Amino acid sequence: MPEIRHSLYRFEISQSEIMGVSVKVYIGGANQGKLDLACIENHKRVEEACICENCGREDIFSAKLIYGLHHYIRRFVFSEEEKDILIERLRAENTQAIIICDEVGCGVVPIDKREREYRELTGRIMTELAKTADEVIRVFCGIGGRIK
């Protein structure tokens, strides 16, 4: 049931509550416990996750638990146009997604141009997804800190 907030003259219900949208984003470094925390908080099993390291190109658009979006980006997204299509499709087709992605922009900047482009695309995609997500959780040492 959506929470109804009211003022003196009007009632307000957020659009995400009306449409049943509830996207959550978990970000953090490699091996920090993002998947385990997401499963616990959302009553999911690890076996339910779409593992992006070896998933099909279309799998993430129907999966409720997307693990390793950075792997998907490395495998399938190579341009700004593909980035925009990915973001648009995820927003339109997967309104209940739990998205888990490693932070790949920290550390030494790679010499290889493709690696730099991959890191930039991943960062830009995650920035856009976080803007419209209902929750964004940063995970460090298995502990989630809500940043949105």
Report each predicted region and the residues it spans:
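Short secondary-structure boundary segments
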Residues: 29, 69, 101-103
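Short, solvent-exposed loop/turn segments at secondary-structure junctions
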Residues: 32, 71-72, 105, 144
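Short, flexible loop segments at the rims of nucleotide/cofactor-binding pockets, characterized by
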Residues: 49-50, 75-78, 114-116
